[in-house]
Amino acid sequence: MTLKRLDDEKTAPIQNGDSLFKESNMLLASRKPSLYTEMFHRHPDNPILTAQDWPYPAHTVFNAGACQAGDETILLCRVEDRRGHSHLTVARSNDGVSNWQIDSKPSFAPDPENFSEEAWGVEDPRLTWVEDLGAWIIAYTAFSPSGPLVSLARTTDFSTFTRLGPVMPPEDKDAAVFPRKFGNRYAMIHRPVSAGSSGAHIWLSFSPDLTHWGDHHILLHARRGAWWDANKIGLSPPPLETPEGWLILYHGVRHTAGGCLYRLGLALLDLEDPCRVLRRSDEWMFAPEMPYERQGDVNGVVFPCGWILDKKNGAIRIYYGGADSCVALATAQLADVLGYLHKCPAPPQRKRKGMTSFD
């Protein structure tokens, strides 16, 4: 196949998808600057991981949880095979961008014989270091004929994993635990969907032991109507503790004539009372624009599951899935994000009421 360049009578062969991605990055960088606030900046080498990088057969690689362990960046990547089933595989890098060392086989494979909720795979991990446990807690989606649900696992080295089992009934996903307790309770953000529900909202729940969860609250509502986050919303990476509050990056979905469109927005929660929403962006802040975000197994998707804050310089690295087909990287400055949120409206505080179900 050949591509004719507009500025040249010659034709140039398309070498591979990566070269197209690089050219697209250059074209995007040369566009007239947006008049909107642009805080998230794509890495010029995007996508940083694809199935072509994998040491064993894989259909797609995307939606990676992320953490910093010493001098090493660790991604726990969702890998989908040609059956459509997913597992999780560890990739390690010294700079968080290149020279990834990828496990030679699945690091966290479904175990349907012992955990029937994983019959169709394990997906979309979020990683949280919980200091009082001295371990990483992985919140992931277990998928089976009963529907998706939230399960937890723990690890200290990303070589061995201990399952804590399912903690929410179907249908539920987009979960992550907070890194510390509130009083004597752990807290978790997640996104349940009930039969006949009018929308898919972000919820907050509490637990004394990471096993038994209750005191459920709706944290953020899908806004319906013409809003960019009208139809459903869900947590993206885990909550990030900042001096100003818990920083939340969430995805919002709007149903369009061309299908579902996933974009990202921001919120800020009170440090000591995470049920209290201090700020929420009215505008989306990051959306599918590049070919690797707009075209893939699921078109029009940017879906972060992990981010890493460099406390020395305030830089945030956001690792996201592009079109359910690759792993990409964007960066932002924490000060810019918090500064923007301070200009956003404070949402009305609803009367808090503990819930026993998600109806």
Predicted regions and their residues:
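Beta-rich carbohydrate-recognition and catalytic domains
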Residues: T2-D7, G17-W120, W129-A176, R180-N231, ...
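Polybasic, lysine-rich low-complexity intrinsically disordered segments
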Residues: K10-T11
